[in-house]
Amino acid sequence: MIQYLQVGKIVNTHGIKGEVKAIPLTDNPRRFNKLKWAYVSKEISNEMPKFDIVSVKHHKNFVILKFSGIDDMNAAEKLKEHFVIIDRKDAVKLPKDTFFICDLIGMNVFDTEEKKLGVLTDVLSTGSNDVYVVKSDNNKEILIPALKSVVKKVCFEDNKMVVDLPQGLIDDEV
């Protein structure tokens, strides 16, 4: 499993004292309130700079962060388009049968008769339930509702998901 998780993306500065505006990449933006520090980088690597978090505010759909050592707008500007990254061990504990999206991406998806449907490439948040985007071997996209009645098994050891598709969800050409 992935060692680091992206929990936000810095999209702009906020004010003149070095604060940044971040889009939360988590279902629970309040999780930022408990963070003491985070990595800030354009990509996950072994050499990501680590910043102490001085303050956290919530404004509309954004999180306003103040990092130690980032004290003016020019310094904050350099963090635009960077991700706020945490260690997996610092992540919130998920309820049973709930998964981090990054752990599902790349998973092989099969129907209950062991026919491979494709590879999970994305997860769409629709409000009522998530939808898994599965790309078949012939490049067709299958949209699968992330419901307990549909998703029968998720096995990270085998990198495999088994789904029981509702009648008519896909055509026979997949």
Curated annotation (Swiss-Prot):
Which terms in the Gene Ontology molecular function aspect does this entry carry? ribosome binding
What are the PRC barrel domain coordinates in residue numbering?
A: 96-169
Keywords attached to this entry: Chaperone, Cytoplasm, Ribosome biogenesis, rRNA processing
Please give the function described in this protein's UniProt entry.
An accessory protein needed during the final step in the assembly of 30S ribosomal subunit, possibly for assembly of the head region. Essential for efficient processing of 16S rRNA. May be needed both before and after RbfA during the maturation of 16S rRNA. It has affinity for free ribosomal 30S subunits but not for 70S ribosomes.
How does the annotation summarize its subunit structure?
A: Binds ribosomal protein uS19.
Instruction: Present the record's domain note.
Output: The PRC barrel domain binds ribosomal protein uS19.
- What is the name of the protein in this document? Ribosome maturation factor RimM
Organism of this sequence? Acetivibrio thermocellus (strain ATCC 27405 / DSM 1237 / JCM 9322 / NBRC 103400 / NCIMB 10682 / NRRL B-4536 / VPI 7372)
